[in-house]
Amino acid sequence: MVAVDYLLAGMISVLTGLDRVALVQIMISRPLVAGPLTGWALGNPLVGLEIGMLLELLWLGRLPVGAAIPPDDTQVAVGATVLAAGTGHFVGLDGMPLVLLSVLIAIPLGKFGQVFDKLARQVNDRLAVSGYNALMSGHTAKMERCHLLGLVSFGLASLATALVIVLVGTFVLFTFAPVLIGAIQEAGLSLQYSLILVGAAVLLGTTNVNRGISLFCTAFIGTLLVLWLR
């Protein structure tokens, strides 16, 4: 990867981060979209899609609505994709083992997204007071600047989260990849299925109990029918 690739990834980080909370909200911030979008910009959309699919289930029931500030799933997807696309050939990994290792490293680093998101909201609280005072004083231009600065604070929070994930994740990959390569390659398929099952459990946990039971029974019967028809 060259500097232009990292610049593109940074732009996608800011764009998807703004879509997550502050601007438009057309769902490009979802891992299932942010991952492939980052991968496409870096020339490897398949890696981004694999990362996005694994992360989407895990975070589908945790949205940044109201006062809720979950770990930043958007930047986890962006950061993990950058890690997988940019460091694989250096550590001697590719394919699903590299994807799994990148995801496992990026997920805990997503907690930094909560910290930066809280800081951005605190800054925006002060900007809201300044904007209100400016409006009451008749300074509409200053009020508009305060409004736009609120977008900047969220954008910088997203970029900072992605930077932490990429920088710390790269250090962890280069340091521990030689030790973890064997274990990841050996447990690759079972680990992949484990993440999918955990994601499915998280998703079912957010649904209505009666509806969840109905969905489970329908899926179970459908699977039996498919096996019987084969």
How would you describe each model-predicted region?
Residues 33-42, 78-88, 217-230:
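Small-residue-rich segments of transmembrane alpha-helices in multi-pass membrane proteins
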Residues 11-14, 51-58, 67-83, 87, ...:
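Alpha-helical membrane segments and immediately flanking helix-loop junctions
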Residues 16-18, 39-41, 61, 88-89, ...:
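Hydrophobic alpha-helical transmembrane segments
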Residues 9-17, 60-63, 75-122:
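Short helix-perturbing small/polar motifs within transmembrane alpha-helices
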Residues 1-7, 38-49, 85-105, 230:
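Helix-coil boundary and interhelical linker segments in multi-pass alpha-helical membrane proteins
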Residues 1-75:
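Hydrophobic transmembrane alpha-helices
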